[in-house]
Amino acid sequence: MRVSTIRSGRICRLALCLLVLLPLLYLLANWSDHHKRVQEAYHTRFGGPKFAHQRLEGRPREVPKLVDGLGNFEPKDVKPRSGPGENGEAHSLSPDKKHMSDASEMEYGMNIACSDEISMHRSVRDTRLEECRHWDYPFDLPRTSVIIVFHNEGFSVLMRTVHSVIDRSPTHMLHEIILVDDFSDKENLRSQLDEYVLQFKGLVKVIRNKEREGLIRTRSRGAMEATGEVIVFLDAHCEVNTNWLPPLLAPIYRDRTVMTVPIIDGIDHKNFEYRPVYGTDNHFRGIFEWGMLYKENEVPRREQRRRAHNSEPYRSPTHAGGLFAINREYFLELGAYDPGLLVWGGENFELSFKIWQCGGSIEWVPCSRVGHVYRGFMPYNFGKLASKKKGPLITINYKRVIETWFDDTHKEYFYTREPLARYLDMGDISEQLALKKRLNCKSFQWFMDHIAYDVYDKFPGLPANLHWGELRSVASDGCLDSMGHQPPAIMGLTYCHGGGNNQLVRLNAAGQLGVGERCVEADRQGIKLAVCRLGTVDGPWQYNEHTKHLMHRVHKKCMALHPATQQLSLGHCDVNDSYQQWWFKEIRPRW
């Protein structure tokens, strides 16, 4: 009897287990089939492998491979689209809407009325090298947070940026898009934006500053909020191109201390035509001149020889600042951006120098292309942020950067180019210097010798200034002025305002007379503002403090002011002519 009871109990328990297990086995089988269908759908869309492989620690990571056919993330069977602006073509509004175009350009610095007639999902021409279409990339590249900072951006331009990222990124790599609102006051960027992003079901998040912080600090906040392994920063007026993300992530997958930069295409701010900025086979990289203006130079042969293929990434000393990818944890280990930098300007150099000098590297990626709208003008000012510092904010930022990362010799080049910067209060940089010491960072001389060696080819070290300040006429007491013109342009004499800028003139020990990054030259037309000859720091000018003559040594004539016309020219030197006499007045900031 007892044996029969035990057997009956075992049979009941077995039946109960089967009742529980059978549904689980059914669900597992269906999940496996669903997973297979997802992989096949992914393979159809992107040409990628059918099964993902988890990363294994200690196992060498896959590297990109050049293949005969299309690369694994290249889109297949893309149907052509028709409509305004499709394929990146220019779009023009009808003549009766000209007033709308003009009004939106005044408000946004770009033609938002034109943008509003173009699809959020518009196609753009593939501007990549042909070779870029034939790279296979590792499937398990890091999941990415795309961070987009905006302030009073045109709604359609902002959302086209978002849609282009979603439409042209492998789904499993795009972790999230974070829109960081730097205290916008336009109504359509409040409730309308919040409602619009609901369609993305959590993929797109909006966070808002409670006061205006500026681009730099707002980006750092976005990095803090992000949860992806890699963060990609984009400006709020971009359109990413075909297969832009995998080539941007692959170098970081190989080495977490690499920062990658896409090649930037241009989008016209009036008609939204998408077009490449660079020639197809020409590669450029970011450098700088000693006033800390961003410049670009063709990639030197020394760098070209490091690569086997023309479409592979290459090293760059710096970058323009708006668009790049970096491992999130590494970015935070570097201290993110210097919190003492205000609004924008100089953050691209600060991050570049910090990365290179502290053990990382920067690579530009030819197979990653992103279009960027270059505004006609900046439609908003710095607001209350401008009152937080006395003096030009961007120059203050530059001073913080050079005082942290430059050696003494290179600091002098900056102060030679920007003499008034010596008198700016840059704030406390002790934390930045402590970070530099803690990370055991290399010297700036090392950076110039091994990474930015081509800077000297275009921008040699600057000789000291013999004289600087306002160049005043003895006869009229007016000041030499570039008049805000771009070279080539005739210079004039205007009221001395004491603020420097277009009236801040420098004469260096090699005879170069300069205003900002431009040089002062002379010909039959008069005294002209000209582009300085690259690779040179000398000039034809000589100042005699006794006679107050500024002589052109080639023409053997002196700078003169015409008494009647007030025009500037060269004349035969006459020690008794006060219209040929000049004096430099060093100025001090009125900050």
UniProtKB/Swiss-Prot annotation:
Short name of any one Pfam family annotated for the protein: Glycos_transf_2
User: What CDD domains does the record tag this protein with?
Assistant: beta-trefoil_Ricin_GALNT7, pp-GalNAc-T
| Pathway, per record | Protein modification; protein glycosylation
Which residues are connected by disulfide bridges in this protein?
132-367, 358-441, 479-496, 519-532, 558-573
Enzyme kind, highest EC tier: transferase
User: Main site of residence?
Assistant: Golgi
Question: What's in the domain note?
Answer: There are two conserved domains in the glycosyltransferase region: the N-terminal domain (domain A, also called GT1 motif), which is probably involved in manganese coordination and substrate binding and the C-terminal domain (domain B, also called Gal/GalNAc-T motif), which is probably involved in catalytic reaction and UDP-Gal binding. The ricin B-type lectin domain binds to GalNAc and contributes to the glycopeptide specificity.
What's this protein's name?
N-acetylgalactosaminyltransferase 7
Q: Which gene encodes it?
A: Pgant7
